[in-house]
UniProtKB/Swiss-Prot annotation:
InterPro entries: AF2212-like, AF2212-like_dom_sf. This is Putative antitoxin PF2058. Gene3D superfamilies: AF2212/PG0164-like (4.10.1150.10). SUPFAM superfamilies: AF2212/PG0164-like (SSF141694). Keywords: Toxin-antitoxin system. Belongs to the UPF0165 family. It comes from Pyrococcus furiosus (strain ATCC 43587 / DSM 3638 / JCM 8422 / Vc1). Possibly the antitoxin component of a type II toxin-antitoxin (TA) system. The keyword Magnesium does not apply. Coiled coil: none annotated. Pfam families: AF2212-like. The keyword Transmembrane helix does not apply.
Amino acid sequence: MQVIEAIYEDGVLKPLKKLKLKEHSKVIIKIIDEEELEKILDSMVIEKVEGIDYKKLKEAYYESL
């Protein structure tokens, strides 16, 4: 399974990174827009740990997608 970011432009989803797929592979795509992802992340229950910068943690999560 891969999680990728893409831009929707002119009726086409365009991946921001090269996909590791064989030509003509059939895939299933679940669309989660940035607003929905933000709600999901904000709803997660994370125990607050002293000394952790949660803003940087959230940024690292986005970068890992």
